[in-house]
Amino acid sequence: TLRKAVDYFAHLCIDASFYDFIAEHDAEFAQSEYMHKLAWLKHDKETVYDPECDDILRVAFMHMYPRAKLSDLVSLLSGRDFETREYKTEIIEDTYDKLKQGVLNVINQNNFTQFMLAIRGAGFISSKLVNSKMALDFAYALYLMLVTKKDVNVSEVKRIVQKWYVLSVLTGRYSSSPESAFYRDIKLINEMGVVKTLENIEAATLSENFWNVAVVQDLAYTSTINPTYLVYLAAQVYNNDLSLLSHNITVRYLI
């Protein structure tokens, strides 16, 4: 049933009408605890981030464990103890319970809508401005880490998530070997806290040379899926800028 909850959530993110199909054709699931938790998707119109099954499992796993590889999740569900390299029944049960809670956190209406408000609030109002679902996956996992662990003030959560997402897109932080990069960042966050980790990453990657040379060179490319260009457009949306040669049409309207 948990597997179906993941599958149905992914399907409903794309096709809200599928809810009625589930109600009519899957009586067992319709009577489960998960059905009413998906009911809000009947009216969902979100298109910026439509997570697939792998994305849902990845986000659920990452914010519940200090790990990021889905292969590790498979091992844990098989009962593997990474320290002793033995297989234990209690690990299977504990992993399933944590994964279930993780999935419930991911599909929770308030969590998902508040996360999307943060992303949209940063200027990313369309899927046209998103070229890295991996960056969104980590940003959502980070959001869930912050709201569940409550390590930072609630009023700061969205700002931190926005900064992390923009930084990761601008620098291509998760463009290659994303699971290894996820694990590294989760480890740093657990060791130093998210605020200090973010400050260190900013200091290490967003230097004057980055802004004066790398960004300028990236903007010289003509590709419309260039990450730097997409962040530039999002910044214009954020600032409510007018489009070129227009006195009343905003960039937001044209995207």
Features from the language model and the residues they span:
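Solvent-exposed functional surfaces
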Residues: T1-A203
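Intrinsically disordered, low-complexity N-proximal targeting/linker segments that flank membranes
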Residues: V169-L254
